[in-house]
A protein has these predicted regions:
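Flexible loop and strand-edge segments within Gram-negative outer membrane beta-barrel domains
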Residues: 17-49, 55-57, 61-127, 133-168, ...
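Conserved C-terminal beta-signal and adjacent last beta-strands/turns
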Residues: 421-547
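Transmembrane beta-strands of outer-membrane beta-barrel pores
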Residues: 4, 15-19, 70-76, 118-120, ...
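Signature of Gram-negative outer-membrane beta-barrel scaffolds
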Residues: 188-290
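Outer membrane beta-barrel strand-and-loop segments of large Gram-negative receptors
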Residues: 38, 171-175, 216-222, 334, ...
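Repeated loop/turn-to-beta-strand initiation elements of outer-membrane beta-barrel proteins
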Residues: 6-9, 19, 61-64, 122-127, ...
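Surface-exposed extracellular loop regions of Gram-negative outer-membrane beta-barrel proteins
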Residues: 16-28, 34-37, 44-53, 57, ...
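Outer-membrane beta-barrel signature, preferentially recognizing the C-terminal barrel domain
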Residues: 222-228, 271, 300-354, 370-384, ...
Length: 547
């Protein structure tokens, strides 16, 4: 960081060279066959992230500048899949399918933000203007090959294929935020325009089960385009009525137009809608120990750009993965009531999630194929209560503990599946300890326990996660040495069951959340140097690319 007179500069560079391992186990009960599929997924990556920022105070009331972000990633992945197929009257598999996929991905992300901050008076009235552009490109290639061995009668078949996808996403956005504090209330208003264009150029070949492989891999070309335009306006106000009562209200309107086009199918799908998103927050302090608060909000959850890509990739001839060009965003209404008494907070809540999308495995009874696809598949209603207790009576120990219990019901849409209605409960505790008087030796212990749960069509089994951290502060606390461990006992496994198209599925997934990290951080230079961190105007769109 550099800060002198009217000019402020900031720069950061981060490089990460690492890897991860995922373990997937699926058990599918077809009417005449039982499938056990295990996938071992390994990925190695080299990531570089750089941020450069500048801001200049042209006058006492006008500051402008820019922020540039560049991310690059070079990832190579290997996925080995083994499926064993059983007849119910026999304990030995009659068919074994072995597949290997080697993937290479080279995503690049570049983003430029131009900002202006104009102060209108000394009371805090100001205008913020953000102009943003980003470009995201990714070349993804996935060749695969394998064998299918049937034991009775003995027969060996082969398969191979490749899938290449060149994706490019461009986004332009402009955002204006106006803050208007007055003696009566604090108001804010603004608007945003966002234009996104995504293009996918796909080449693919899938041999299916054959006796002789084709080494040439003759590929079929396809193109997929997705355009999204969003116009939004909002207004909100905050009013402190007296020492006990405070109110905040807001309203956002969004108009959205999307168009997706598949070249091979010569099919275009247009979607247009306008939605209102109200919010309200009311707070009442009965006395110094008791506070009541009610809030309501409506929000939208959009699919990321990869989930909208209908690109079809094969893991084996019987297992495929694809996105969905007609995937729609879903909407969530949240109602919450809080009561806080000293260090104890009670929350009652109710949520409605409409037209939720998720990845679902669609089994086909005739072929025993499973198609993993993103779909809008259910509505969820949830009612719950949570208790949070904070313990801080000892100067060397601070503890925050939460117990949450809720009941949910689901209704499927365009899917023949058994819904998972029932209770969900989890407990979390986070504890900070000062191990010496100067408070330079710190320790943290956190523990999460997911007892049982239901979500849509999935019944979720229990899991736990334990994390530890030790930090030592030196040289006037400018030097920080941190040793951190997450999921110490490797118990953070996602296990669930579901029934789709009459096929029972039981899954056990581990996403390599166990990690040990040693970090050394040293701050040098003047402690007075400080460059204001700013948010860009396209945070939501950036997140949908994974950046």
């Amino acid at each position: 960081m550099y800060n002198k007179n009217k000019l402020s500069l900031s720069a950061s560079f981060n490089y990460r060279d690492g890897g991860e391992y995922h373990d997937y186990r699926d058990y599918n009960s077809f009417p005449n066959e039982f499938w056990i599929t295990r996938q071992a997924f390994k990925r190695e990556y080299k990531r570089l992230n750089s941020v450069l920022g500048l801001q200049y105070a042209a006058t006492a009331n006008w500051t402008f500048g820019f922020q540039y972000i560049a991310n690059t990633n070079n990832a190579k992945a290997n996925r080995i899949t083994k499926s064993s197929v059983y007849q119910y009257e026999n304990s030995n598999p009659f068919n074994e399918i072995l597949s290997e996929v080697n993937a290479s991905q080279k995503p690049k992300f570049n983003s430029l933000n131009l900002f202006n901050e104009i102060k209108l008076d000394s009371l805090g009235k100001k205008i913020n203007v953000n102009l943003d552009y980003f470009n995201y490109v990714n070349f993804d290639t996935r060749p695969y090959e394998g064998t299918s061995v049937r034991k009775i009668p003995f027969n060996i078949q082969y398969f191979n294929g490749i899938n290449n996808n060149q994706q490019s996403t461009n986004n332009f956005s402009g955002k204006v935020d106006i803050e208007l504090p007055t003696t009566w209330a604090n108001w804010s208003t603004g608007g945003k325009i966002s234009v996104s264009k995504t293009e996918n150029y796909i080449t693919a070949f899938n041999s299916g089960l054959v006796t002789t492989l084709n080494p040439d891999l003759p590929q079929i070309n396809n193109q997929y385009h997705y355009d999204e335009n969003v116009q939004a306006l909002y207004v909100s106000g905050n009013k402190k009525i007296n020492d006990q009562f405070e109110a905040q209200i807001g309203l956002r309107m969004e108009a959205i137009q999307t168009k997706s086009h598949s070249g091979n199918r010569n099919q275009s799908i247009d979607n247009k809608y306008t939605k209102l998103f109200p919010s309200i927050n009311l707070s009442y302090s009965a006395n110094k120990n008791s506070t009541y608060r009610f809030s309501y909000s409506k929000r939208i959850a959009r699919p990321n750009f990869a989930e909208l890509n209908p690109n079809l990739t094969y893991v084996t001839p019987f297992l495929s993965v694809e996105g969905n060009q007609v995937l729609r965003p879903y909407f969530v209404d949240n109602f919450e009531f809080f009561y806080t008494y000293k260090k104890l907070e009670t929350k009652l809540y109710h949520s409605l999630e409409n037209d939720v999308f998720n990845q679902v495995g669609l089994p086909y009874l005739e072929t025993s194929n499973i198609r993993l696809i993103y779909k809008n598949i259910f509505d969820i209603r949830r009612y719950g209560i949570s208790q949070t207790f904070t313990f801080d009576k000892l100067n060397w120990w601070n503890s925050i503990n939460t117990l949450n219990i809720n009941y949910s019901t689901a209704k499927t849409t365009d899917l023949m599946a058994t819904v998972a209605n029932g209770f969900t409960s989890f407990f979390t505790t986070n504890n900070d300890f000062n191990l010496n008087k100067p408070q330079t030796l710190l320790f943290n212990f956190s523990f999460d326990y997911y007892m049982f749960g239901n979500y849509g069509i999935d019944k979720i089994k229990p899991f736990t996660s334990t994390s530890l951290a030790l930090q030592y502060l030196l040289l006037g606390k400018d030097l920080k040495i941190t040793l951190k461990a997450t999921d110490v006992f490797k118990t953070d496994r996602f296990r669930f069951t579901s029934i789709v198209n009459g096929v029972h599925r039981s899954s056990d997934y581990y996403f390599d959340t166990r990690m040990f990290q040693l970090a050394i951080n040293y701050k040098f230079g003047s402690k007075k140097v400080n460059v204001k961190k700013r948010q860009t105007g396209n945070e939501d769109e950036r997140a949908r690319t994974g950046n």
